[in-house]
Amino acid sequence: MTEYESSSEEVKREYEDQIAKHGRITNMKRTLLHNVPAFKAYMEWYTLYDQLVPVIGDRAISLFSHAISEGNECLICSIFFRKILIDSGDDPDNPHLSDTEKLLVDFGGAICKDPHNIPDEISNTLSARFS
């Protein structure tokens, strides 16, 4: 893991930015800071998040992201989004989903199964709902 005191100025700026924006820096992010371009690529998730909040809301983003994390069998990612859901009062094992949230969860699962072959029902419903 990257230690702040022994880091370059560029790494220190990224480290400080994380603390300012999120109050802390996770071990995974500290590890990624060994390579600033890799860290920045990972952090683009937050850019996407900020763009999607006005369209689908925080909860839907967390459910969608959790579905993708589960589908990819990414334990760290699954735990991250699971914690967000639990902290917001949801039960990730038995969420009560709106039609839009169900569609996004199904889409997340389909992306993991075969991103080049999303079922027509999901694709058509997404197009109708978000076009």
Question: What residue ranges belong to the model's regions?
Answer:
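Mobile cap/lid helix-loop segments that border enzyme active or cofactor-binding sites
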Residues: 1-58
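Short alpha-helical scaffolding segments that buttress acidic/His motifs in well-ordered protein cores
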Residues: 32, 46, 63-68, 104-112
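Short acidic alpha-helix initiation/capping motifs at coil-to-helix transition points
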Residues: 39-43, 75-77, 112-121
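Short, thiol/selenol-centered motifs that function as redox-active sites or metal-ligating centers
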Residues: 61-84, 88
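Alpha-helical ds-nucleic-acid-binding substructure associated with the helix-hairpin-helix region
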Residues: 93-117
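Alpha-helical bundle/repeat cores within regulatory domains of eukaryotic proteins
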Residues: 123-126
